[in-house]
Amino acid sequence: MACVTFREPISATVGKRMVFTGPAYVKDHLPQVAQHTAYIGEKRPALEKTGDLRYLWRPASNRSLPAKYKPEYVGEIGWGIPEYDFINKTRLQTGFHIKYEEFSQAAIDKLSHRYQSPWQPNPSIMDAEGSSSRGFIAWHMGDYEDTSQRNSKRAVLLRQSKAALPIGSRPPKLPKLPKKEEKSKFRPLHQHDARCY
């Protein structure tokens, strides 16, 4: 019969539940307060400055537990595992896990505009179509090509803008200003200069 031996665990944390863990779950995490953190120098520092760094290494108040378990936070370890779906159900239904910030929206725009032409029709056509015509995504040039063969609303607008306007509806031409006559370099003798008197 084989002999079963029992040995003490290598670490004191083996086989026990860890509440506060350090990096990589190596051991229980306990805050360490550094000694002698006050400022020592030649002159006394200004009153609004502080050299006391004890507040940086202060432990958590009453050693309180974290508010939620890690799998409850979106994107944390264990999040989205089917066994823990009951935790994340409301967040999945509301789309909370998908966040479009400034840079991700810019990346989406760059990808969606890659195979689109940035061509846009004349501003007069865009004005005729209304405020929604100046949209976010570029226009499709195919809607405006071969306008004689298409009957879409946009093609009709383009044809109308290209057609010559009748004389009565054209804006009137402004009269040209008369050219200024060149002044002679010499003044007549009978005119008196007011600066002399």
UniProtKB/Swiss-Prot annotation:
<feature type="compositionally biased region" description="Basic and acidic residues">
    <location>
        <begin position="178"/>
        <end position="197"/>
    </location>
</feature>
<dbReference type="Pfam" id="PF15123">
    <property type="entry name" value="DUF4562"/>
</dbReference>
<feature type="region of interest" description="Disordered">
    <location>
        <begin position="161"/>
        <end position="197"/>
    </location>
</feature>
<dbReference type="InterPro" id="IPR027814">
    <property type="entry name" value="DUF4562"/>
</dbReference>
<protein>
    <recommendedName>
        <fullName>Protein SPMIP2</fullName>
    </recommendedName>
</protein>
